[in-house]
Amino acid sequence: ELSNSGIGVIAVDGKCFKRYLEIARLLGNKVVVITDNDKDYDVNIKKSYKDYIDNQFPNIKVYSDIDNNRYTFEVCIYNDNKAICDKVFNTPLSRIPIQDYMLGNKAEAAFTLLKKHSNTIVVPQYIQDAIRWIDD
């Protein structure tokens, strides 16, 4: 559990994150970046994070889903947990696909899943890998 591991989590806006990585590089701090591929893994991850992916800085790793169809966290959560998400968010008043609901209501959807299914939800593999690396 992260809360007992000494690992801190910082949500960083896309415009600022490279400054944090530069500081981590200079200090030698172990840092993991977990990010969306935004429908283009090659450009948004491999190209944008080339120095970190090529292991030029072994204390910094970048993790993202490599499948462009799994372009954001909510899409990954839905695809890895369809039965749970459909059960939780499908109501008689639902007028849009469940995944679209989750994309439009990110915080509420995440909170609802955490509250009702924290022990059964499947965490996307790239996030599992990132946590395993940072905790090693």
Give the location of each predicted region.
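Acidic, divalent-metal-binding catalytic cores of TOPRIM
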Residues: E1-D136
